[in-house]
Amino acid sequence: EIYHQYIKEKEAYYYNYPDTVQTAKIINSYSDRIYERLPSDKDFLNITLGRYQDEISFRVDLREKGITSDINELYEEARLLKKEYSIIEKEMIFDLKSSQLGLVGNSLFIHEQLKSYICQLAVFQSYRDLQIIAIYDEKQQASFNWMKWLPHCKLQMLNVYGMVYSDRTRDQVLNSI
């Protein structure tokens, strides 16, 4: 019973916040999960920053009353099972609706992290509900070219891409919104 509850919780985390490989499968199979999050959903604009170990959501009790030496081995086995199924790997969820996220560090690492976060947003939020404007230095344009294929980066009302990397694109995009 503990094992089934543990697996059920683990699957729920994995379903709601799939890893990169699973997300790629969702995209490649044109899954109905694409754009599944609506602005009214609690998890709209949520991204995962990584994984961490935490306690399970249910409680496992182990009573020590009446333990005799005859059942000491059984008790020890139960204690080990409780220990094994009390901790679960969860996603570190970050809500962009209520917080800002700043990234500092090596630009290669930062660009990979940004790619991960933007992909999470682009897969599960519709381009009608989320529009992305990327502002970056013209020298970094090669690192951001992949974004031009995302419908979220095309500002629907203006028929312009939300890619700001020069004075010209700044004036074109930011003065239009």
Predicted features along the sequence, with ranges:
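Accessory regions of macromolecular translocation/handling assemblies
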Residues: 1-177
